[in-house]
C-alpha cells in the first residue's frame, strides 16, 4: 500500500531489516521529517506492524537505531537488578518508570481518599443532621464563643511587675536556671 511512496532507509538505519518495515519508514519520512519522532508509530500505530515492538526492537535497536538504543541503555542499567532501580534514575524505558510512577501515586491516593470516604460523621448521606447531633453532644454552646473576646490590652510595665512579683514569690529560680 505504501510502496509507491517508499524511500530507502536513511543513514541512521543501515540495516536492510529496518528498511523491510516499509510503511513505517514511509511514515517516518512523510510525517516527522526525521527518523526519531514518529518512530513510536511503527510499534503502536502502523497497521502493517501490529506485533509489539519487542521482537523488532531487540535485534535492530541495540546498535543501529538511535531511538531504540536510548531505550536499551536504560534497560541495560536496569537489567542487573530485577526492580530496575538504576534504570529509574536514568533515562529508562517506560516499564521501570511505571513501577515507580504509579505505586507512589497509589500510596498517596489511599491516605488522601480514605478520610473523604470515611469521615468521623459517617457517610455523606444525612451528614448535616448527624453532625449537628454530635456537635450538641460533644460541645457546649459556650465553647463555640470566642474565649479571647473579653481580653483587654495590657502595658509592658504591668507585665514586668507581674513577673518580678511571681519570681520573688516562688523563689524557684535555681530550679530552672543553673
UniProtKB/Swiss-Prot annotation:
It is found in: Nucleus; Cytoplasm; Cytoplasm, Cytoskeleton, Microtubule organizing center, Centrosome. The modification Asymmetric dimethylarginine is found at residues 36, 58, 67, 76. Residues 17-34 have a biased composition (Gly residues). Phosphorylated during mitosis in the cell cycle probably by CDK1. InterPro entries: MPLKIP-like_vertebrate, TTDN1/SICKLE. One of its GO terms (cellular component) is cytoplasm. Residues 1-134 are annotated as: Disordered. Residues 97-121 have a biased composition (Polar residues). GO terms for biological process: cell division. Residues 1-15 have a biased composition (Pro residues). Residues 78-96 have a biased composition (Low complexity). Signal peptide: none annotated. Pfam families: MPLKIP. The modification Omega-N-methylarginine is found at residues 56, 116. Keywords: Cell cycle, Cell division, Cytoplasm, Cytoskeleton, Methylation, Mitosis, Nucleus, Phosphoprotein. The modification Phosphoserine is found at residues 39, 46, 79, 81, 92, 103, 114, 123, 132. Interacts with PLK1; phosphorylation-dependent. May play a role in maintenance of cell cycle integrity by regulating mitosis or cytokinesis. This is M-phase-specific PLK1-interacting protein. The lineage of its organism: Eukaryota, Metazoa, Chordata, Craniata, Vertebrata.
Amino acid at each position: 500500500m505504501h510502496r509507491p511512496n517508499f524511500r530507502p532507509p536513511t543513514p541512521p538505519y543501515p540495516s536492510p531489516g529496518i528498511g523491510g518495515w516499509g510503511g513505517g519508514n514511509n511514515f517516518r519520512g512523510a510525517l516527522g521529517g526525521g527518523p526519531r519522532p514518529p518512530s513510536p508509530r511503527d510499534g503502536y500505530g502502523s497497521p502493517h506492524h501490529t506485533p509489539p515492538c519487542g521482537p523488532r526492537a531487540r535485534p535492530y535497536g541495540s546498535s543501529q537505531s538511535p531511538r531504540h538504543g536510548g531505550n536499551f541503555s536504560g534497560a541495560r542499567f536496569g537489567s542487573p537488578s530485577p526492580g530496575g532501580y538504576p534504570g529509574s534514575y536514568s533515562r529508562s524505558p517506560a516499564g521501570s518508570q511505571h513501577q515507580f510512577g504509579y505505586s507512589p501515586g497509589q500510596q498517596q491516593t489511599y491516605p488522601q481518599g480514605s478520610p473523604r470516604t470515611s469521615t468521623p460523621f459517617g457517610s455523606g448521606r444525612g451528614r448535616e443532621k448527624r453532625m449537628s447531633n454530635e456537635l450538641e453532644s460533644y460541645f457546649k454552646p459556650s465553647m463555640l464563643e470566642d474565649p479571647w473576646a473579653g481580653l483587654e490590652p495590657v502595658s509592658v510595665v504591668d507585665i514586668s511587675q507581674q513577673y518580678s512579683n511571681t519570681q520573688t514569690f516562688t523563689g524557684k529560680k535555681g530550679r530552672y536556671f543553673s
